């Protein structure tokens, strides 16, 4: 008799299904509780005028998403140091996002924690994650260049500090890359959370790509974590689709953004993430180019940044922007996964 429950593919699929079912079942109660406590979204006055109707929509859906992901990960019972580190990054940045969300709700304004406080918090989490990944998770400081079989050694400038009986290895260049990846990804995912279903949909696609990569690497624990996150986002989308009944808030976008960065680091696809998570690169670049152009020339490149608002201002419906961004995400993530797969086969 074949015990299908022991099959890794079955376990990954089960993780997705359980996360979807849990979120679909629990979010109505979560939404009801948020409405009862008047915990609603504060909308920017300088954003698209059509978004003003979203004022007061329940937010902080990311709390339940992260709780479900954690519960499914524990329930599946397949633990590993790297997946635990990735989950810790999700929870830590999710907690920072929660403070930001709560600050907005308490003050009844669209601005929560100051950018300086958020960057400091993200930076501290990134540095701690990097140190633990190298010293506890044994993540290499080498960065693989896709399709070449060549790697860059970012551990050439390394310090070793003695802490009691422990030697703490600090590869400065690699730690800088981790810092940059964690901060840029959390914030660009946060930028993408500006339309109903946009962030959750793109995160789902990229998480599925990383579930496949981790599975290919025989890291079942990491694959299960990514699969659970993808499933939770799908369940959340049931209520976040336009017109949204709930938003994930910074709790979700910062937490899941950190999770994506962590997955790229622990699967050693740091450079390939530029393609797999290319939609977030596009979103971030649109803001950088907009600000730089305005400061240098006094003119704006886009009607509004990030770029998804530009298309809204061109007359695209919110749903059309969302679906087309999903398509672009799928193409980029699929291309990145294909490059990874071909590279490992050749290797």
Residue ranges and their predicted role:
Residues 35-41, 48, 52, 64:
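A cross-family signal for N-terminal binding/gating loops and helix N-caps
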Residues 44-57, 108-122, 308, 313:
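Juxtamembrane helix-capping/reentrant segments at transmembrane boundaries
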Residues 104-114, 145-154, 163, 317:
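Membrane interface segments of multi-pass transport proteins and intramembrane proteases
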Residues 2-8, 54-55, 109-112, 163-166, ...:
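Short, Lys/Arg-rich N-terminal segment immediately upstream of the first membrane anchor
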Residues 117-134:
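Carboxylate/His-rich catalytic cores and anion/metal-binding grooves
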Residues 2-35, 65-102, 129-149, 171-347:
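Alpha-helical transmembrane segments
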